[in-house]
């Protein structure tokens, strides 16, 4: 509310962390609507385009949360469907696109410059990380052009062991699950999904 932003943006991978992040946004709005009432939530969130009478949580969520599934050739159908189902359940505005072209472009440019062919056997971490990092400019663009806060999706367990990807799942302005461990995240996800 104090940020004067229009809501939140999340790169929704269909995994536990991004799912937990959007569930927390949903739960925050659900509880606010129960506690304050629809009219007060609409007023506090400055949702002038919404009718105050009979405004559902689905309508509010569609206006304050954008989720994006950014698939690569290594993404599974399971994660894509999971992201889609969760986005439908919480009523976020949801988009999907492929990052294959951008990943290929980066790898090709570096291969050409270094005269080296990169492969999954020898360069697994670098190839995984380039996929995570190439998603960042796209989701930042969506956040910036909609005056929204980008929520990062890195959890405490990953940070503790150095598993999070800088400029990948750590990319964002606020990290709602940074202090939550993976075990709790999975329990919370199982409760909702």
Description of each model-found segment:
Residues 148-193:
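Mid-to-C-terminal catalytic subdomains of enzymes
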Residues 2-157, 189:
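ATP-dependent adenylation/nucleotidyltransferase module used to activate substrates
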